[in-house]
Amino acid sequence: MVLIRVLANLLILQLSYAQKASELIIGGDECNINEHRFLVALYTSRSRRFHCSGTLINQEWVLTAANCDRKNIRIKLGMHSKNVTNEDEQTRVPKEKFFCLSSKTYTKWDKDIMLIRLKRPVNDSPHIAPISLPSSPPSVGSVCRIMGWGTISPTKVSYPDVPHCANINLLDYEVCRAAHGGLPATSRTLCAGILEGGKDSCQGDSGGPLICNGQFQGILSWGVHPCGQRLKPGVYTKVSDYTEWIRSIIAGNTDVTCPP
């Protein structure tokens, strides 16, 4: 009973904060074409359907979620509209893919991360540029930016032509524990959303970035369906917990293991 009261009070406090912060929300609309130069789209050569997003972290490497892995992945960089091609759009295929513990094993709360080495590097251009790994973990209460080409309807699949962006709040992990049964006491994930609902990542946005105070802090891992439900924030892989693993692989130490 004590735990229930504590979590209830925490939810009330977080909801109060979210209601104030929601007045600042820009999202739910088309992203500015200049704000997502690091955002990439993943699709398969067979279906040609975009199923995930990812983040360019340097000219040769993309970070996304392990649940986005498919055979014959193609990676589209520099894209805004699916139907109107930018002059500097480029397509790449993976040269190598790295998972934690050299496997594809992950859970809803751990190790949902995939590092992709591109077969050919890309150059910076008007619509392509990497974003750095975070210098420090994010703080609860931060306003964070989500983006992607995922469905814009919470109940049916309705993929937009252009990426949509929204601002959500970084919440205490205990909020996600209260909202989603089965989460452990600790995990290498972030909890983010708008507790009164209406703003959320959704189907097709997996693997995309969570940008908090200008830093790349999270990778969309999972959420509930229908999307955008009240008191049901999303779960994001915590990038700052994996920076050492990422940097080691990029430096050539491919035998490095993920944090426990």
Curated annotation (Swiss-Prot):
Domain Peptidase S1, first and last residues per copy? 25-251
Any Gene Ontology CC annotation: extracellular region
Signal sequence residues: 1-18
Propeptide feature: residues: 19-24
Which SUPFAM superfamilies does this chain map to? Trypsin-like serine proteases
Which tissues does the record link to its expression?
Expressed by the venom gland.
Compartments where found? Secreted
Glycosylation: residue positions: N83
Its predominant location is secreted
Give the Pfam families listed for this entry: Trypsin (PF00089)
- Which UniProt keywords are given for this protein, alphabetically ordered? Disulfide bond, Glycoprotein, Hemostasis impairing toxin, Secreted, Serine protease homolog, Signal, Toxin
Q: Which domain of life is it from?
A: Eukaryota
Q: Which cysteines are cross-linked by disulfides?
A: C31-C165, C52-C68, C100-C258, C144-C212, C176-C191, C202-C227
Which InterPro entries does the record match to this protein? Peptidase_S1_PA (IPR009003), Peptidase_S1_PA_chymotrypsin (IPR043504), Peptidase_S1A (IPR001314), Trypsin_dom (IPR001254), TRYPSIN_SER (IPR033116)
Role of this protein: Snake venom serine protease homolog that may act in the hemostasis system of the prey.
Q: Under which name does UniProt file this protein?
A: Snake venom serine protease homolog
Q: Which organism is it from?
A: Bothrops jararacussu
